[in-house]
């Protein structure tokens, strides 16, 4: 009988423990992929800019409404879904010369912290490409949240420039000093996210 009472007590306490672990001022927002974009821009031959995006990605934001700098962001991007509007080029980007999508199917971003910036905020976190993690600082603008159809929605936009060679994206078929593809790549994020249904 004593054992049964212990089991009942534990069953009643567990939900309370889990509830206490998530503060009331933290809200979970899931990325709405149909209203979001994860893109990039890079110079080609030094004379033109090629733009592209990844079609498949997911992630979430844990928004601390009391202190935004305590919020966290997690994003997973599937490299095989890269799209620059040119099938031949996209296949090359999926190959071992660049993202090697078969061996490295995802790119990830995980925040370390959020800082107050001069205008808006700065995401500081680890960007991982081809199993190479580098700390990046992404200035971003946060809009919202608003309430629509019983759910809260917010938007965030930001960009950051990275050196592709830091992530072992080394391909260049014209030798040293002449880049078919610039070393510098601008990553562009336009995210809309909503609370779960």
Each predicted region: which residue ranges?
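Low-complexity, acidic/polar, glycine-enriched regions of mature
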Residues: 21-197
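Short linear motifs centered on Gly/Pro in flexible linkers and helix caps
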Residues: 3, 20-21
């Amino acid at each position: 009988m004593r054992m049964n009472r212990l089991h009942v007590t534990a069953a009643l306490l567990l939900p309370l423990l889990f509830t206490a672990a998530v503060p009331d001022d933290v809200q979970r927002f899931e990325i709405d992929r149909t209203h979001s974009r994860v893109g990039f821009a890079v110079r080609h031959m030094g004379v033109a800019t090629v733009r592209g995006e990844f079609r498949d990605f997911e992630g979430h934001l844990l928004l601390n409404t009391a202190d935004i700098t305590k919020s966290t962001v997690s994003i997973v991007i599937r490299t095989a879904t890269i799209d620059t509007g040119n099938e031949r080029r996209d296949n090359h980007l999926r190959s071992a010369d660049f993202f090697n999508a078969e061996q490295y199917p995802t790119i990830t971003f995980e925040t370390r912290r959020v800082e107050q910036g001069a205008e808006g905020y700065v995401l500081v976190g680890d960007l991982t490409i081809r199993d190479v993690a580098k700390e990046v600082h992404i200035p971003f603008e946060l809009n919202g949240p608003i309430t629509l159809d019983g759910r809260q929605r917010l938007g965030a936009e930001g960009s950051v420039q990275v050196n592709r060679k830091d992530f072992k994206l080394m391909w260049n078929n014209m030798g040293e000093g002449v880049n078919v593809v610039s070393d510098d790549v601008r990553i562009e994020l336009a995210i809309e996210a909503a609370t779960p249904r």
